[in-house]
């Protein structure tokens, strides 16, 4: 929710020297800017979306994890500002790149956004500046993509300017503040690493330096592939448990009582967000350059990508058995479309794919999400939560603001893909669980 303040917008970006400029005012850039600014650094956010820039300069945050009440005083004091003018980068001591690294339609790395930004930086690069890439990517990106562009200016990394990679570790909607999460840093040279570590160390509690940008790049991929593989394991187990008539949630909870040798992961309708569904493909693509096939990682990706299809089948079974209805013509409410609880981000959300599959099967689909007012690409807006109007309510994202016990009482049929209904759902003949 954007909280509006009365802080006036400056007519233009103040002309000054900035400690840090961050290219990309999104889910990574804004929390990072907030962290540096609250630590006493002067910060400039650079973004091509003028509406975002204007809002930030009024002290209005479009990122839920950084409330406007915290942002506005920093703007008013001149510690933080925003601009769409890349020329302002000339006045920054350090330039951090926090831009998306999506996949192409062919599910291959798309670095076009960060490459374009690096070219803009190169036009303004001066001696003594530090450039750090934060965007998640494959090992070799900093050295193979950014370094040649920046050195085409005639300046040399490690001598005239510094270049490093430090992966973002933002977890939207979580209790983890940016300054509390250790920062991994790997520079082109030791001097590059040292300069980057000094910058991050001024605002973040712990900095861990590795030997190269490649090591830092692979660190981030390992973190997210670890989650992808383990989630795939429990997703596959959930499908087997469905056939065996065993409650997978009960099994996972029981296994989690072991105090060693087990980490609990929960099944669900698929992966979502800007990292976990995307990152494995970055590594598998790069691995092919070395004649290596990451079979285990790719299999996990296939299992997770198949989950919306399994969930569609589960909804169909529930309608057939509980209401003697087919999917075609049924009224279905999807509850929660953000990719994780209590945030507004729908990037790569499995809810979007599930809605598409349900529509293709002839269902009339609506959704309710207290954090996501609309999904323009699907032509949908969030509807009031009135479960009794629908043949089936499907819980896709378990936002904490929903009373799930009341939901069960008011619904004819609930398909619970997140175990949000807990014991009440287990004991109710109206609830089907993943």
Where are these regions (language model features)?
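Structural/interface elements that position substrates and couple domains in central-metabolism enzymes
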Residues: 2-434
């Amino acid at each position: 929710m954007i909280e509006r303040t009365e802080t006036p917008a400056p007519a233009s970006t103040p002309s000054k020297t900035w400690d840090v400029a961050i290219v990309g005012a999104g889910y990574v850039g804004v929390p990072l800017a907030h962290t540096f600014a609250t630590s006493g650094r002067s910060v400039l956010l650079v973004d091509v979306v003028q509406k975002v820039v204007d809002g930030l300069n009024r002290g209005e945050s479009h990122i839920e994890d950084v409330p406007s009440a915290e942002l506005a005083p920093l703007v008013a004091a001149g510690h933080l500002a925003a601009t769409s003018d890349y020329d302002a980068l000339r006045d920054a001591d350090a330039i951090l790149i926090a831009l998306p690294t999506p996949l192409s339609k062919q599910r291959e790395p798309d670095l076009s956004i960060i490459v374009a930004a690096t070219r803009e930086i190169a036009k303004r690069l001066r001696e003594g500046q530090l450039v750090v890439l934060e965007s998640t990517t494959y090992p070799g990106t900093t050295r193979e993509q950014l370094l040649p562009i920046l050195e085409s200016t005639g300046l040399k990394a490690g001598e005239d300017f510094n270049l490093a990679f430090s992966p973002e570790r933002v977890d939207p909607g979580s209790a983890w503040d940016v300054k509390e999460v250790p920062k991994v840093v790997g520079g082109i040279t030791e001097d590059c690493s040292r300069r980057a570590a000094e910058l991050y160390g001024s605002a973040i509690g712990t900095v861990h330096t590795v030997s190269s940008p490649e090591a830092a790049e692979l660190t981030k991929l390992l973190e997210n592939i670890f989650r992808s593989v383990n989630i795939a394991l429990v997703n596959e187990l959930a499908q087997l448990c469905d056939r065996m008539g065993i409650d997978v949630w009960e099994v996972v909870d029981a296994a989690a009582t072991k105090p060693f040798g087990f980490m609990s992961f929960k099944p669900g309708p698929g992966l979502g967000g800007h990292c976990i569904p995307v990152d494995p493909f970055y590594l598998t693509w790069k691995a092919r350059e070395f004649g290596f096939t990451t079979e285990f990682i790719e299999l996990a990706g296939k299992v997770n990508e198949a989950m919306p299809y399994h969930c569609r089948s589960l909804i169909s079974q529930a309608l057939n058995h509980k209401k003697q209805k087919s999917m075609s013509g049924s009224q279905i409410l999807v509850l929660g479309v953000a990719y994780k609880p209590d945030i507004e981000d729908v990037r790569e959300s499995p809810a979007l794919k599930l809605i598409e599959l349900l529509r293709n099967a002839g269902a009339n689909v609506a959704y309710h999400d207290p954090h996501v007012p609309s999904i323009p690409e699907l032509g949908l807006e969030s509807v009031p939560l009135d479960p009794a109007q629908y043949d089936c309510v499907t819980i896709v994202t378990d936002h904490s603001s929903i009373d799930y016990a009341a939901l069960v009482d008011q619904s004819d049929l609930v398909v619970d893909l997140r175990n949000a209904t807990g014991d009440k759902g287990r004991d109710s003949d109206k609830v089907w669980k993943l």
